[in-house]
UniProtKB/Swiss-Prot annotation:
Organism: Lactococcus phage p2 (Lactococcus lactis bacteriophage p2)
A Pfam family assignment: Phage_p2_ORF12
Protein name according to UniProt: Chaperone protein gp12
Induction field: Expressed in the late phase of the viral replicative cycle.
Keyword Nucleus carried by entry: no
Length: 91
């Protein structure tokens, strides 16, 4: 089997943020009564989608950059829960 980058490493290369730290931040925000969770959830959802399904890191970074300015993204109908479950199979 050929060597490959982990999903967490690809996520960091694409978004500039650590996936585990982003997951912790999401958990923290969910516990707050007035937590701001939408931006964080979309950040993780789209970053994780790109890390899992876009093999071209340069294109993934470009797509993520576009998302950061427009807040529009397409995950082919895959929700955050499904993406996290796919990633957790790797851990």
């Amino acid at each position: 089997m050929a060597k490959q980058l982990s999903t967490a490493r690809k996520f960091k290369m694409i978004t500039g943020k650590d996936l585990f730290q982003q997951q912790k931040a999401m958990d923290t925000e969910l516990k707050k009564e007035d937590g701001e969770i939408t931006d964080l959830m979309e950040f993780v959802q789209y970053g994780l989608y790109l890390a899992l399904f876009q093999d071209n890191i340069v294109k993934a970074k470009s797509d993520f950059s576009d998302f950061r300015s427009s807040f529009e993204f397409d995950t082919d109908g895959k929700g955050l829960k499904e993406l996290v479950e796919l990633w957790q199979k790797e851990i």
